[in-house]
Amino acid sequence: MNQFLPLLVTDIHRTIRDAVVLTLQPEDPSAFDFKQGQYLTFKQDFGGTELRRNYSICAGRDDGVLQVGIKRVDGGAFSTFANEVLKVGDTLHAMPPQGSFSSALEPDRAKNYLGFAGGSGITPVLSILKTVLAREPKSTFTLVYANRAVNTIMFREELEDLKNRHMGRLSIIHMLESGQDIDLFTGRVDQNKCAELFKTWIDVSDMDMAFICGPEPMMLAIADALKSQGLEPDQIKFELFSESQQGRL
């Protein structure tokens, strides 16, 4: 359905200095029922030019809200507008949820999931892990989350809360470019770094499904590393984006 529908902005909060989480209220909630990992396409007029941008839903399916996370991109018209101009009470327009960055949920099975996120690529992965933890009570989720520094980690407090609430089911490995006590958790996530992680911290042979969202070179390197450990292509899900269309993230 290629139709834009109104969404009332009911809350805006910052998860880091240059990223906001928007809570949105549709006139017709049924039109915005979503699967974990999906995204919304927004349109907005800027000086007579219509821009369309995709932003991933960061809420879980059982959160009872529709939320997207938007990180400000240098020179990005929509992301700057969302971070600096948009206010509670404004109305945005978006198409109903789209995307297939998910897998079927099986409440009776005990599955092991692995997620990799780079920067704002956490938004769809957060939706997936929250939904899995809520709807597959026997399943586990391991998240490897790469950022430049501690103060650039989106949803850091929420992730810690989730880890405490689901003790033993959610593991989080923060990878930072610097400032980590453990060398393994310092530096970019590339194929060599994955090989080290898989040797000492993550048993890929136990994993049923992997989700990867972040810069394309990182995702391709991770996928190659996972395949070298025996994961099949249909066990690896991507959410790709390019520099010219960063809105999804």
Where are the regions that the model predicts?
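Ferredoxin-reductase
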Residues: 2-91, 95, 108-111, 147-149, ...
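FNR/FR-type flavoprotein reductase catalytic core
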Residues: 80-249
